[in-house]
């Protein structure tokens, strides 16, 4: 089963994303801090990480840098920060993709599919889920 880890300091966001992904048959886990997220990446070896940038303690940029020291897991940034400088700095820190909240669920799923295809994984979420027009809030 396809494993996705969401790391965001907002429990409502991680719960919403986890529910959205689980209702589509995916193995979704969550962490509400960068430190806990790194521990989970080591423990469960997710296929994709969805990561917020602005978090207390270890922020998303720091998480990207740390994860890149031990893993090539695709990292999708999902944040409210929309300036070109933020996008560039996240990609420079090791992120693979960047989306700005709010995002339609279909767009999120399409980006997850692209990341798995680029990673060359044998798993595909394309056939596991249906896409609808729901939009994830900020």
Each language-model region and where it sits:
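Short, Lys/Arg-enriched segments at the junction into DNA-binding effector domains
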Residues: 3, 116-138
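Receiver (REC) domain active-site loop signature in two-component systems and cognate sites
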Residues: 55
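Conserved acidic segment of CheY-like receiver
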Residues: 1-12, 17-21, 49
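C-terminal output helix
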Residues: 85, 102-116
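Active-site residues of response regulator receiver
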Residues: 8, 52, 79
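Active-site beta3 strand of CheY-like receiver
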Residues: 44-50
């Amino acid at each position: 089963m396809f494993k996705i880890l969401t790391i965001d300091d907002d429990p409502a966001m991680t719960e919403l994303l986890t529910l959205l992904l689980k209702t589509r048959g995916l193995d979704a886990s969550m962490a509400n801090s960068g430190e806990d997220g790194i521990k989970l990446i080591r423990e469960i070896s997710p296929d994709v990480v969805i990561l917020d940038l602005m978090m207390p303690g270890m922020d998303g940029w720091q998480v990207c840098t740390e994860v890149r020291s031990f893993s090539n897991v695709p990292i999708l940034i999902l944040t409210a920060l929309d300036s070109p400088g933020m996008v560039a700095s996240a990609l420079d820190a090791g992120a693979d993709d960047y989306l700005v909240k709010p995002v339609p669920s279909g767009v999120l799923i399409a980006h997850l599919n692209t990341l798995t295809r680029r990673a060359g994984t044998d798993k595909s979420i394309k056939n596991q889920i249906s896409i609808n027009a729901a939009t994830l809030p900020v």
